[in-house]
Amino acid sequence: MRMATPSSAPSVRNTEKRKNKKASSKASVSFGAPSPLSSESEDEINYMTPPEQEAQPGALAALHAEGPLAGLPVTRSDARVLIFNEWEERKKSDPWLRLDMSDKAIFRRYPHLRPKEDRPDAPSHAEDAMDAKEPVIGSILEQDDHKFYHYSVYIGGGLVMGVNNPSAAVCQATIDVEKLHLWWRPVWEPRHPLDSAELRKCVGMTVPYVATTVNCYQVCCWIVGIKDTWLKRAKISRDLPFYSPVQDWNVDPQEPFIPSKLRMVSDGILVALSAVIGRPIKNLLASVKPLNILNIVLSCDWTFSGIVNALILLAELFDIFWTPPDVTNWMISIFGEWQAEGPFDLALDVVPTLLGGIGMAFGLTSETIGRKLASTNSALKAAQEMGKFAIEVFKQIMAWIWPSEDPVPALLSNMEQAIIKNECQLENQLTAMLRDRNAGAEFLRSLDEEEQEVRKIAAKCGNSATTGTTNALLARISMARAAFEKARAEQTSRVRPVVIMVSGRPGIGKTCFCQNLAKRIAASLGDETSVGIIPRADVDHWDAYKGARVVLWDDFGMDNVVKDALRLQMLADTCPVTLNCDRIENKGKMFDSQVIIITTNQQTPVPLDYVNLEAVCRRIDFLVYAESPVVDDARARAPGDVNAVKAAMRPDYSHINFILAPQGGFDRQGNTPYGKGVTKIIGATALCARAVALVHERHDDFGLQNKVYDFDAGKITAFKAMAADAGIPWYKMAAIGCKAMGCTCVEEAMHLLKDYEVAPCQVIYNGATYNVSCIKGAPMVEKVKEPELPKTLVNCVRRIKEARLRCYCRMAADVITSILQAAGTAFSIYHQIEKRSRPSFYWDRGYTYRDGPGSFDIFEDDDDGWYHSEGKKGKNKKGRGRPGVFRTRGLTDEEYDEFKKRRESRGGKYSIDDYLADREREEELLERDEEEAIFGDGFGLKATRRSRKAERAKLGLVSGGDIRARKPIDWNVVGPSWADDDRQVDYGEKINFEAPVSIWSRVVQFGTGWGFWVSGHVFITAKHVAPPKGTEIFGRKPGDFTVTSSGDFLKYYFTSAVRPDIPAMVLENGCQEGVVASVLVKRASGEMLALAVRMGSQAAIKIGSAVVHGQTGMLLTGSNAKAQDLGTIPGDCGCPYVYKKGNTWVVIGVHVAATRSGNTVIAATHGEPTLEALEFQGPPMLPRPSGTYAGLPIADYGDAPPLSTKTMFWRTSPEKLPPGAWEPAYLGSKDERVDGPSLQQVMRDQLKPYSEPRGLLPPQEILDAVCDAIENRLENTLEPQKPWTFKKACESLDKNTSSGYPYHKQKSKDWTGSAFIGDLGDQATHANNMYEMGKSMRPIYTAALKDELVKPDKIYGKIKKRLLWGSDLGTMIRAARAFGPFCDALKETCIFNPIRVGMSMNEDGPFIFARHANFRYHMDADYTRWDSTQQRAILKRAGDIMVRLSPEPDLARVVMDDLLAPSLLDVGDYKIVVEEGLPSGCPCTTQLNSLAHWILTLCAMVEVTRVDPDIVMQESEFSFYGDDEVVSTNLELDMVKYTMALRRYGLLPTRADKEEGPLERRQTLQGISFLRRAIVGDQFGWYGRLDRASIDRQLLWTKGPNHQNPFETLPGHAQRPSQLMALLGEAAMHGEKYYRTVASRVSKEAAQSGIEMVVPRHRSVLRWVRFGTMDAETPQERSAVFVNEDE
């Protein structure tokens, strides 16, 4: 005999039952199902395993070796094994396939196993049957079923398959198999018999069934793969007569089923309904074209509805309305697989949504329904308990009368199936389990579970019949486990574990750190508890070893360092290691941990004279030296004091400094056996990330199989998976997929992927297996497995799935188009009826007419000279009435200056409205004087517009403009008449001023009074009850919140939510007079009082010696509130004032004072922050203005100088500018190039984005992790800096810029070369003293507009000019002293850190770009309005990093808080408060901006990829310079989600070419732009070249003194030769041709300007720019002759 080995699969074996015998010669007793492994009866001989098989434990099924039964199973158990094997293999391609291991299936598959007494005798019915030959398998049979014909597919053995029993004429039917029992005849036969097994795969599938279209014949066509329909039936041939179902090959057919009359009536109704939606009726309507006939009768009126009607009629005329294009194929392409199973699946998705909508419509929620069902639930539980009791009693009675069968044999049968599955898995997947640690562990775990279950059964049933079976099962489990362990012990290689050795002095916390590190690494590998230990010293027993992923080896070398080194060499190797164990069950245990963490006190891993020093050092992947100066200092100060040492240690191990030696190193200095390397500072997070990455890298290198893509199972799904793994974008994937549909072989399909990198993989196509890959544009295809035996019927199941989905899509499209067609038809008919029935008015016509003499046209203007049209009044797009204080009515800059002079002369009590009235009055007087001078006194005065309007109103005349302003329905009553209003007022209704509980919980005790939580971040209170400055509040330090005040109103803003349990409320600046609000008074005794207050006006009230600003109110509790205990008392200050505005509760202020009677109260309201830090000098200030400026609140009058109307740009030649050339920005209303608004209006347009709402913050946990990772990165790379002195801070400032507020002078005027003198000297000294004392100073910024070259669209189109912020000199000095050292440290590391401030494009650029080129993907983004979209919360997180890394953190914290507090910006007329956006103008602004850019980009990448920030930074390279960026990464980023994340943060990212849409990523660095330079590469490296447009602009324009006419020319100056030389260097990078063009223009300019300069050759300039030399000795191969040619 030969053996067959099935593959593995989970299954549950059905309990085997014996057939009932008609006659039995011998009585037998059975205790259930016979044992699968042994038999005690002759009747069950078919279940026995032959004796010769018991000696072969590896055999799973016995087959006949010779004779007529060769290759067939010996027993039924063997047959089950073979059936299981076949099912396991076919299940991979057909997951829906069911496992049938019953006796019926066995006898049908293997008839020789059927007992003789069970085989039918096949009675003869020759007298009733007309003999017919058995049809060919796969034939379509037409059967006479009374009123109609029924079709099915013959599959052999007298069985037919198809939709034999549909439940209704329109339903979801199931493909089934039944006996042939109707008169039949074959109407279609295949050329060759089809595979019956392949046909049977369709059994059990569901298909849509419609009696008139998708019926039994259509399903038969789907099964056999022919193209035909029931309406055509072109493939049917009716040459043969009908035959009787009783034949020799069809025994005992069943009686035909005759449906009832009710069933026939219901089927008729369903058929009629389906015919309405079906296409025949629509085709008939399309041929008649009823809408086209209607369109001939009626015409279009060219209204909106008429146009819609015309489009409908045109659609009908061109046959696209009633028969729209078939979109079934397009809908099918959306689905990756044909998996739609029918309306049931659709109902699972749609029904919950519909039920939810119905519940919402009726106001039902889960809470209300839960309350209603609570009582029902309790009653059901009681009834359930009673029912359980009754069932138990009933079971006992039934068991006494009819004993049940023993369930143990069924359990044993199930266990045998599971063991067969494991044995098959061991046989077929052994190599994969040995290579994959998780698969091997899962296999052993399943064996342990099965062994436990078998032992439970053996302990429960101790009879002899069960004991033999359980023992045999246990033996098979032990053999499987032993076979796996033996195979694992015989491996020739394994994954080498990662070794981390931490060396340092004792007692500094190394062991605790390593334990924590082990847990973190284990958690990163997927099992946090998988941490073990290695026995040390003389203990050499590994019984406690459980195969943990991470093991800890403490005190390496404590006893015998040479012995420990030998053990380390053995464990940290790829050769398998068998451990020494004492217990017999642990014999043969292997060491398979992935990470080994070692602690030691030695300075070197092993002695330097050790013979295998190099081998040991090579096996240590991370040699880390731990130092703790803090612990050493504590021990030195307090020897023997354990508490002092513990106090010096930190739970985050920040007291330990870790230094990473180079790989293979053996000491602290970085020496290796091959020379000296570089040591690095590393953190715990980075060490953990590197170790985990190395583990995964080695595991991937140790992998066994490539990915497999099965195109036979599903072409679309396999292609999508293959393209996604190759990194092909979705839009390119769709284009390649369309081309691949026409490919006939794998070679053609791989040729389409030649432009992409396809890793080696396997492809299954048409039964054959191919090894394919595409590396560096070379596709490779190798056939490794030929297809199996050819079959005439291929993938019939797939065809049915495809046809079924196509049918569903067609049905859905038919229903939708039927609804649209009905709606369109109704609309067209209604439109025509409504058009003919509505009345016609003369004003409906689009033309004017006159009836005769004296008639007038009401549509024409009455421009007859005696009146002027007033235009529309009321609110329009430009506002209501006359413009306010911030709309200058088109005033020029001179008129605006005149208005300011008049305001100053009148003491500030002069508005723009007054100025406009005075100007109009003066113009009228001037006109009158001129006319008197010309015509004399006798000439009548000319009527002004205002006088003419007054005269018309007096006479009762109406102008044409008034007539046109009227609406046609002015005389119609809108809404119901007042007489029909039946509403009534309930004068007895009681008004409840009590606030809900959720608002009362916001009132908390604070300081000496109370406070109120507006949101989780904002807390308000009265200023005089708050604790002193610098006090910790609600557990938060002063650095975690900002404080602003307005009078006695105090507001705290916390950076992180203190009360996340409460939603945000609306905080308003007081309310309108007459509003009734509630003051929520809380007392320490627990009393809560809600007092109604009618709010009055805003006022300043003197209470004692203090003046309180707020809103007054009158209590509605009576004349003497305090006497009745219904008023406020001392201690109630800080309680909130709230009122309900619509359905929303609003808080308007806090309680600060009350009169003695208690009837009048005062609420401090939320105004703008006071300017208490400002030191105003000079005469008394004017009353502080109120209102807003460009949406931003006004704080005070401004002092900034007027905006400049001059430019520093001059033309280099008088030639005309080329089209599209850039020009200096707009210069104001005097600009001769264009007639535009004032510069103040341009500035207001630039300020508006600062008042817009901000975006959302990144998730808190992601933001915290990103900030920690960035801080760790900077802390490990930046060198410690020394604080700057006052002199160095002054020297670092640019002396050619303005000093800002309050002097606004150039800094060089008061600079002696070493110090500031005069006014600026006093200001700088005062700021330096405030810094050194750690006191706060509020920065005051000055707004200006940048003078720069811009696109013509920003001058002649929509005028734009960039906004500049200039800080005062004091803020510059304080910021330079606080953050100057940090900025210098960043500049020194600009090549290694992502912040590139301070980089040189020609010197540092090649190194930076080379780092980017090491990664796979590259992207750059251009951000719109970067500064105005920034959030102060993100800037504060960036500022916290700068503060912690500055040399003086305590003093730097004060400066950073001042910089990030609400900014005070001087715009000339006013000082405004800006609470959001980036405040610029300080020495550290660029670094702060770049750091915030780094945080936002990293947060977006972490949120999209869900990868730890340290790993993201390890797999990526960033370059940030303000808002400019370049990002390179190896991670697979979803660019749509990445772009949406950035927009969710409030940013406005666009592509580099300013196109809208998701950001694009490239697989090459070529073409990425950074700092206006395109990154290109050649054989010598990467470099950045300036774009040609910038080079051309520098040839057209030069800088000089300010002037008004930008087109004036300036002769050559002293700096121009160096500028032109640098320009030649930039042009040399674009190739010799472009260099010659620029060189000729430079020579021409030099000749015209009298500049003496020599233009070098292109090659010399290129050497100078690229390699820093112009010598002729430069090697010829480095000249890059053919590299930089023009594109």
From Swiss-Prot:
Residues 476-641 form the SF3 helicase domain. The sequence shown is that of clone CW1. MNoV infects tuft intestinal cells that express the receptor CD300LF. Disulfide bonds join C1482-C1484. One of its GO terms (biological process) is DNA-templated transcription. The modification O-(5'-phospho-RNA)-tyrosine is found at Y896. Residues 1-13 have a biased composition (Polar residues). Residues 595-700 are annotated as: Important for mitochondrion targeting. This is Genome polyprotein. It comes from Norovirus (isolate Mouse/NoV/United States/MNV1/2002/GV) (MNV-1). Mg(2+) binds at D1420, D1422, D1524, E1525, S1569. Residues 995-1172 form the Peptidase C37 domain. Its EC number is 3.6.1.15, 3.4.22.66, 2.7.7.48. The record marks D94 as: Critical for determining viral persistence. Signal peptide: none annotated. ATP binds at G504, R505, P506, G507, I508, G509, K510, T511.
